[in-house]
C-alpha cells in the first residue's frame, strides 16, 4: 500500500487545510485491484485514488494511468485491424480460388457440350444420308411401279375404247338402217371419217351438224327454263338454220355437187353468233357459259374459214366434170 500526504491534495482543493486539521490521519490509500481481477487487454481498469472522510468519499484517476489506458486501447485496435486485414485477405484469396474453380468448371462444361454437339451433328448427318438414300431408292421403285401400272392401264383403256367404239358403230349402223333417210345419211357420214382425227379430212357438215343441233337444243331448253327471247333468236332460229344448211351440204356432197354456197351460209350464221357473244364478253355481261359459247363459235368460224381457203386453192369445182375422191370415202361422179 502507498500513502499520500494530504498536503498534495491542496493543489486540487484550496480548502484542504480544513481537511488536514480535522483529520491528519488516516492517510490516503491507493487501492489497486488484484492481478487476477484485471480484464483482458481490450478492457483495462486503472487504479483510482480514494480519499476517505467521514460521510464524504473522493476519488480521481492518475494521468499516468490514463496514458497507459490510451496506449493499451491503441494497441488493441491495431491488433484488431491487423486481424481483420488478415481475415479479409483470406476471404479474398478464397473468393479468387472459387472464381478460378468456377471458370475451370465452366470451361469443362463448354468443352463437353461442344463434344456432344459435334457427336450429334455427325450422327444426324450420317442418319440423314442413310435415310435420304433409302428414300430415293423407295421413290425410284415406286415411280417405276406407277409407270408400269400407268402403261398397263393405258393399254387396257385403249383396248376397251376400241371395243366400245366398234360396238357403238355397229349399233349406230344398225339403227341407221331402220331410221329415215336423213338420219341414215348423217350416221353414215360420221361413221366413215375415222373419228375425225385429221382436220383437213373433215368437211363443213361434220362440224355444222353437231354444232347446229347443239344450238337448237340448247336454245330451246334455255327458253323453256328462263323464257329468254335471245335464246329463241340465237339458239333455236340460228341453230336450226345452221343445222339445215349442214344437212343440205351433206346431201350435195353425196350427190357430187358443190357445197360452197352452203359453206358460206354456215360461215355467216356462225359469224353472227360469234360477234354477238364477243360483244357480251367485252361488255362484261357474259358468264362462264357465255365465254364457252364465244370460244366454241370462234373455233367453228375458224374451221369454216380454213375450209373456204382450201376450196379456193383447189380451183374449179367438180361441177365442170371429172372425179374426185373425198375424205370420207365417197366418190363424186361427173355431173
Swiss-Prot record:
Basic and acidic residues composition bias: residue spans: 88-101
Its membrane topology: Multi-pass membrane protein
Record flagged with keyword Transmembrane: yes
Cell location: Plastid, Chloroplast membrane
Pfam families: Tmemb_14
Membrane spanning stretches: 205-225, 228-248, 286-306
Chief location of this protein within or outside the cell: plastid
Transit peptide residues according to the UniProt entry: 1-72
Keyword Glycosyltransferase: no
Region annotated Disordered, chain positions: 82-101, 316-335
Cysteines paired by S-S bonds: none
Biological process, per Gene Ontology: embryo development ending in seed dormancy; fatty acid transport; positive regulation of triglyceride transport; regulation of fatty acid metabolic process
Coiled coil: 101-160
GO cellular component: chloroplast; chloroplast envelope; chloroplast inner membrane; chloroplast membrane; Golgi apparatus; plastid
UniProt entry keywords in alphabetical sequence: Chloroplast, Coiled coil, Membrane, Plastid, Transit peptide, Transmembrane, Transmembrane helix
InterPro entries in the record: TMEM14, TMEM14_sf
Additional observations: For all TMEM14 proteins, 4 hydrophobic alpha-helical domains are predicted. However, NMR structure determination of the human TMEM14A showed that only 3 of these helices are membrane-spaning while the amphiphilic N-terminal helix is probably located at the lipid micelle-water interface.
Function: May be involved in free fatty acids export from the plastids.
Family stated for the protein in its record: Belongs to the TMEM14 family.
Protein known as: Protein FATTY ACID EXPORT 3, chloroplastic
Native organism: Arabidopsis thaliana
